[in-house]
Amino acid sequence: AFLYKDKKESQEILTTVFDRFPILKERKNQDAATLSGGEQQMLAMGRALMSRPKLLLLDEPSMGLAPIFIKEIFSIIEEIKNQGTTVLLIEQNAKMALGIADRGYVLETGKIVLEDSGPELLNSPDIQKAYLGG
């Protein structure tokens, strides 16, 4: 874990994380294993944000989550992105991912077959038909 020597700075960062994930503040004394899947995902993101990264890597953050948590997680990811942190997102929920992406890449068997802006890929009839069920 990343440690700050300055307790004040550490507390400020923790306050920022709790502001972004208020449910974690309510559950701060609860064992992580007893949190719901969405809460565990928020905890993982909060822990990663404690180090104030310039780049945040997220691998399938919506996997196994209830729809209400998926919307919340993507809203938080978009907020993190809009505040200046670069987010590299690997996600099978292409509609949600492309909806917040500046840039998107379509991979097939490990190779990039298409790349464009998130909105362009999301609105492409070919992409809709081939990958988004449209």
Question: Which sequence ranges carry the predicted segments?
Answer:
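ABC ATPase C-loop
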Residues: 48-49
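Helical segment within the ABC ATPase nucleotide-binding domain
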Residues: 71-83
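ABC-type ATPase nucleotide-binding domains, specifically the catalytic core motifs of the NBD
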Residues: 1-12, 20-25, 116, 134
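Conserved ABC ATPase signature
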Residues: 31-35, 39
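Short, glycine/charged-rich "phosphate-handling" switch motifs in NTP-dependent
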Residues: 103, 115
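Conserved catalytic motifs of ABC-family nucleotide-binding domains
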Residues: 52
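Catalytic Walker B motif of ABC-type/P-loop ATPase nucleotide-binding domains
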Residues: 56-60
